[in-house]
Design a protein with these regions (language model features):
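Short coil-to-beta-strand transition motifs
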Residues: 59, 123-131
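Short, P/G- and charge-enriched loop/turn segments at secondary-structure junctions
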Residues: 118-122, 183-185
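Active-site loop/helix belt of alpha/beta enzymes
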Residues: 1-118
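A residue-level signal for beta-strand positions that form part of recognition/binding surfaces
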Residues: 95-97, 131, 147, 195
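A general structural signal for short secondary-structure junctions and capping/turn motifs
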Residues: 39-41, 87-90, 124-126, 137-142, ...
Length: 263
């Protein structure tokens, strides 16, 4: 029994500071609600304040493996957690709970929030990707820029935006050895119901005619990291599990996880 709040606005943040301020404001905002509940419950009733979203779960990682005094963010977090966790507020014994969100999976939206003080790249942080087949390649000036048509669209990726780039997904460098050394990202630039178009990510005003060919071939499979893992993951009944630490066998399926269906 307790209060449940979801910090949806925190997805627009871009720093640990913004994630912390969102968490602080959300917790503080629950206090007046506790006061309103006081007349309905005994004073010795234990309640849980359940707050946060994926950025706040990632924020907690700033506390792992370090002395809080080494980080201003971690030090402030400790202060808020001590104040609101396992203490008495508005006459109730209160414990604090932070929503895990997609902490164990991650996605491009979460990397964009920069809620943790340090991140690795997409390849090391994001556990969910969608495999799609290349069905057409346009590298011969047929279009304004090099493009690749793939057999997945909104029904397989979702259509959730990410605030730090214009695209609907990012192609993993696992898709082609040529992408590993590329200084550009290959992104899902346009998306329709059942197909989408890949293109090089470009800066505003950049001449697209000078872009290099996309190193993919018809029939090849590409791995795409989604903007929002919740939407993308909900579209599939099962997940193929691989182990990226197994050198030479990174793409071998180790298990199949069936998804719980329904709400």
């Amino acid at each position: 029994m307790g209060l449940y709040s979801h910090s949806s606005l925190s997805y627009q943040g871009a720093s640990p500071r913004e994630a912390l301020e969102s968490l602080r404001d959300e917790i503080v905002g629950c206090v007046p609600a506790l006061g309103k509940l006081r007349k309905f419950y005994r004073s010795d009733r234990a309640l849980t304040i359940s707050v946060g979203a994926s950025p706040q779960a990632n924020l907690m990682a700033n506390l792992l493996g370090k002395d809080p005094s080494e980080s201003c963010i971690a030090l402030e977090m400790h202060g808020h957690l001590r104040k609101f966790s396992n203490s008495e507020i508005e006459g109730f014994k209160v414990s604090l709970e932070i929503h895990a969100g997609v902490y164990s999976i991650m996605d491009l939206q979460q990397l964009a929030t920069r809620a943790r003080e340090s991140y690795e790249g997409n390849e090391d942080e994001i556990a969910l990707s969608v495999i799609a087949e290349v069905v057409s390649v346009y590298n011969e000036s047929e279009r304004e820029q090099p493009e690749v048509l793939i057999a997945v669209g909104t029904l397989g990726l979702g259509r959730e935006p990410c605030h730090n780039y214009r695209g609907w997904g990012v192609v993993s460098s696992r898709s082609s050895s040529s992408l590993v050394s590329s200084k550009r990202r290959l992104v899902v630039e346009r998306i329709s119901q059942e197909h989408s178009n890949l293109a090089w990510e470009v800066a505003d005003g950049e001449d697209k005619k000078s872009l290099p060919p996309i190193p993919l071939e018809i029939g090849q499979s590409v791995f795409i990291y989604p903007n929002h893992a919740c939407f993308t993951g909900a579209m599939y009944r099962s997940y193929f599990v691989v182990d990226s630490t197994l050198k030479g066998r990174e793409n071998r399926i180790q298990a199949v996880w069936d998804r719980a269906i329904g709400w």
